[in-house]
């Protein structure tokens, strides 16, 4: 057994001269490899040259073939590297030094000897540099990889791990269900989120976890070390990142962590009858599963082991990601060794509904007493194919695989025995549908002979046949779906026009979450919007001041509620103007006007009006649980040339580039609270209309710009009466 961290700390690795005792043989061979080459070359050269003019005693010739400085350097270097191994080369070097002294005393021409010695040193320098290059290459390719494994990058230290318990999870779940009922389908899709009873923080990353009670120290074998290292290296668009495992510390727990995915699980969507899972969603999710699984099977990890609709997670961009892959055999080994047990209370338990979906060859260990299973099953490639058939069946039938056979709400122990003893399989009706081809493949997946189950490529071909009209990712399919609905529904009677409007609205709302309306419209029409430059546009940044104070005073739930509330009011302001919200990052809010829709120079006035309204909102805003809290914002904007375009294919985003963005950000960051700061060139555009009141702040040092003349925007002169009637608190801006 190897404790990788202890090994690595004891034998810190680096470049030349830092290997441990395991690598001394390889190092010794590499370091001394040039010596015989050197001996042969110099011997031939020396003997040929000496035969014409000189005759040297044997000891003198041997002296010429040695380089005392280089050999001593090699000796002491290897002594430093190898420690106790130095005796292997110390005595040859000592003998070489004695022979050198004897041969020097017998030599008759020291001038020639010194000349030969000089030439040998030049040759040795070249050979030595070459040997070092070979040495370092061997370190990088042979030893470096093993060293990185011994670092145990997959191990999560307890100091980096924090478990967050959501005490209001049940209440939040109830509100989520009520919101889904109250909202229309499009809104329910975009706002749907999972509710977590608890989650983990690893630094700043949120993670889902499964935690076991650790009874005794877990020894990591060489095979486990290699496997976990390879597991940590896996990266794919359809895999939820494996963050690592926390174990062998004073917490007495073993915790497996992977990336937290927010929108929902595939199981939730399949069993939710209010969610319209048509062939667009089915084909996209099925392809995502096969892509992730194929990557796993071709990787050194080679299997998933716990594949179920509950471990297929849908992220915020409607991309399916597979989680909890590759850990089942490691967990089972530790269960068998009695290193771990399930905790008394756990957020993650394996229900019968999941257990009956696992391959029979892996659940034979099930306890027939009827006790709820509390352990994982082992995994294999063929077992994963069995589970894929269960997932596809659930997506097609929108029901638990055995729910149509047993009238019970959820499967139980009796069903388990029927599966194991009587080869029971999920019920497939005789009704002819376009999905019959895929259902036949599902039956092949459930073959009791693992070697006769279909391959991933067979399943991919079945999906292509079954859903021939659904190709590409989910966004492409939604666009084509909308066009298809439009072509079909336009020929129907007026009674069907409502369905068309609903389908269009659903598609466009999903697209408008990620892109401006005009860009989404172009994509809908099959036009790829090119990146372009704009001669003039205005960018505004709004930042909430003293946000760190709120973070310290309020629990996370109230902080998120506060941000949702204030940014929702800001969004309302944006909708009243010709502008586009680019993004929100933490407490910072970014808006642009003049892109992608050019508005004939009105962009600077649109942003000026928005900034005044946003500041007015902040002055009148009160925190629900803290009436004394005064919201303060700082606002900065700047007008100038800008470049914009859609970045990304799978997950497109509309991004802005150019010095104008940086300048606007500097205007905000150098602005005092409750002020609206702009540059001189932007201020002159506002002053030219005689509609706005501005105050010259003066010269301000701006990072990257030097000394800049800045102005504060105070008010829109013709809106004085409206501001007073709204009860907005005035602020001494001109002081």
From Swiss-Prot:
This is Receptor-type guanylate cyclase gcy-27. Residues 538-668 form the Guanylate cyclase domain. It comes from Caenorhabditis elegans. PROSITE patterns: GUANYLATE_CYCLASE_2, PROTEIN_KINASE_DOM. PANTHER family: GUANYLYL CYCLASE, RECEPTOR-TYPE GUANYLATE CYCLASE GCY-10-RELATED. Belongs to the adenylyl cyclase class-4/guanylyl cyclase family. The keyword Transmembrane helix applies. SUPFAM superfamilies: Nucleotide cyclase (SSF55073), Protein kinase-like (PK-like) (SSF56112). Expressed bilaterally in ASK, ASI and ASJ sensory neurons. Its EC number is 4.6.1.2. GO terms for cellular component: plasma membrane.
């Amino acid at each position: 057994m190897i404790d990788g961290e202890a090994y690595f700390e004891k034998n810190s690795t680096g470049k030349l001269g830092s290997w441990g005792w395991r690598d001394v043989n390889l190092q010794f061979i590499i370091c001394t490899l040039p010596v015989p080459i050197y001996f042969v070359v110099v011997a031939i050269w020396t003997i040929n040259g000496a035969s014409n003019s000189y005759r040297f005693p044997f000891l003198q010739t041997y002296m010429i073939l040695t380089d005392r400085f280089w050999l001593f350097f090699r000796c002491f270097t290897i002594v430093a590297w190898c420690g106790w191994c130095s005796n292997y080369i110390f005595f040859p070097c000592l003998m070489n030094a004695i022979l050198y002294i004897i041969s020097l005393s017998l030599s008759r021409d020291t001038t020639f000897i010194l000349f030969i010695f000089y030439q040998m040193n030049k040759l040795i320098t070249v050979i030595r540099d070459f040997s070092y290059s070979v040495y370092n290459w061997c370190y990088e390719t042979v030893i470096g990889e093993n060293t990185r494994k011994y670092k145990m990058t997959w191990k999560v230290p307890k100091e980096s791990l924090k478990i967050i318990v959501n005490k209001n999870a049940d209440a939040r779940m109830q509100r989520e269900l009520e919101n889904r009922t109250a909202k229309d389908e499009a809104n329910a899709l975009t706002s749907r989120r999972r509710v977590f009873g608890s989650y983990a923080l690893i630094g700043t990353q949120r993670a889902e976890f499964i935690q076991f009670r650790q009874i005794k120290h877990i020894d990591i074998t060489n095979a486990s070390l290699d496997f976990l290292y390879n597991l940590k290296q896996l990266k794919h668009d359809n895999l939820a990142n494996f963050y690592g495992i926390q174990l062998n510390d004073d917490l007495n727990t073993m915790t497996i962590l992977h990336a937290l995915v927010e929108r929902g699980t595939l199981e939730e969507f399949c069993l939710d009858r209010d969610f319209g899972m048509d062939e667009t969603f089915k084909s996209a999710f099925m392809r995502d599963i096969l892509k992730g699984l194929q990557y796993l099977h071709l990787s050194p990890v080679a299997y998933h082991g716990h594949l179920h609709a509950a471990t297929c997670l849908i992220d915020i961009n409607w991309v399916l990601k597979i989680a909890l892959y590759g850990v089942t055999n490691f967990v089972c080994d530790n269960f068998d060794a009695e290193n771990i047990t399930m905790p008394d209370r756990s957020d993650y338990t394996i229900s019968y509904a999941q257990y009956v979906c696992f391959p029979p060859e892996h659940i034979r260990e099930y306890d027939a007493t009827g006790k709820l299973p509390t352990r994982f099953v082992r995994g294999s490639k063929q077992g994963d194919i069995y589970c894929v058939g269960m997932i596809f069946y659930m997506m097609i039938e929108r029901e638990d695989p055995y729910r149509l056979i047993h009238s019970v709400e959820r499967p139980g122990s009796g069903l388990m025995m029927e599966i194991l003893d009587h080869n029971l399989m999920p019920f497939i009706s005789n009704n002819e549908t376009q999905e019959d081809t895929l259902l036949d493949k599902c039956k092949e997946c459930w073959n009791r002979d693992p070697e006769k189950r279909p391959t991933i490529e067979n399943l991919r071909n079945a999906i292509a046949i079954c859903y021939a009209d659904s190709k590409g990712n989910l966004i492409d399919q939604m666009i084509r779906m909308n066009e298809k609905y439009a072509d079909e529904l336009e020929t129907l009677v007026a009674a069907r026009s409502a369905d068309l409007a609903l389908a269009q609205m659903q598609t466009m709302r999903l697209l408008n979450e990620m892109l401006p309306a005009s860009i989404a419209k172009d994509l809908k029409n099959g036009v790829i919007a090119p990146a372009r430059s704009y001669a003039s546009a205005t960018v505004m940044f709004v930042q909430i001041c003293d946000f760190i104070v709120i973070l310290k005073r309020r629990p996370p739930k109230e902080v998120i509620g506060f941000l949702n509330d204030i940014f929702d009011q800001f969004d309302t302001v944006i909708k009243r103007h010709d502008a586009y919200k680019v993004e929100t990052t933490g407490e910072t809010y970014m808006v642009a006007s003049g892109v992608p829709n050019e508005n004939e120079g009105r962009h600077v006035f649109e942003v000026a009006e928005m900034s005044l309204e946003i500041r007015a909102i902040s002055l009148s805003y009160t925190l629900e649980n803290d009436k004394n809290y005064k919201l303060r914002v700082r606002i900065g904007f700047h007008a100038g040339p800008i470049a914009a375009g859609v970045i990304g294919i799978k997950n497109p985003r509309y991004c802005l580039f150019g010095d104008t963005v940086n300048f606007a950000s500097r205007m905000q960051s150098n602005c005092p609270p409750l002020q609206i700061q702009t540059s001189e060139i932007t201020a002159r555009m506002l002053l030219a209309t005689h509609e706005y009141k501005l105050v010259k702040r003066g010269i301000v040092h701006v990072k990257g710009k030097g000394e800049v003349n800045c102005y504060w925007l105070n008010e829109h002169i013709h809106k004085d009466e409206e501001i007073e009637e709204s009860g907005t608190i005035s602020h001494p801006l001109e002081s």
